[in-house]
Amino acid sequence: MNTPHLLSSLSRSQLQDRLFGDGLDLLIPPFAVRVQSRIDVVAEGLACLYADYQIPPFRGTGFSDFHVSLLSCRRWFRPLCAFQLDGVQPFTPLALSEAFALFEWGLNWCVTSHCHQWVTLHAAVLERDGRAVILPAPPGSGKSTLCAALMFRGWRLLSDELTLLEPESGLVMPCPRPVSLKNISIDVIRERAPDCTIGPLAHDTQKGTVA
């Protein structure tokens, strides 16, 4: 049986080689995702924020729930990035600098659009002492900021963006991924948790500055 390795075990050139080629297989429980991209900020974001996530020891050795690509469009004038799932482009392309943010947003869309075995809530969820607290809120209300702050106060992150509930048991299916912070929230968390890891910033997005 193959033992998974961590993404951090890959050098930057090895990471790019996989992203440029058949794709990087990344285990983001409960999902397996294959990512392809030649955009530098995608490799940078994955190396920074997914370093402790598992990858199969050999390329192409596992099943992937989602095959996603981040492709550059318009090479010279205001270059853009497009998100694709299985070769289908569900969104309008965004600025190339937003490519890693688009990966995160696109992955959220993959889950909400295709994983109907759970009740999916737009809510952060954390655990402490075997109990989960669910934080439902509209975008821009500070949900992710509160979620990140609680993480540094002894709470365990189960999900920042989507709460997946088992319909029969009512239990939460953990799907921990990097917390998405915007604008002043980035500095708030940096001040409260100086040792936290902040990924590449995307400026001038529709949501402002996103990390």
Task: Enumerate the predicted regions with their spans.
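Short linear motifs in intrinsically disordered
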Residues: 8-18, 58, 68-74, 114-117
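Glycine-rich, often acidic-flanked micro-motifs
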Residues: 2-48, 62-63, 124-138, 152-211
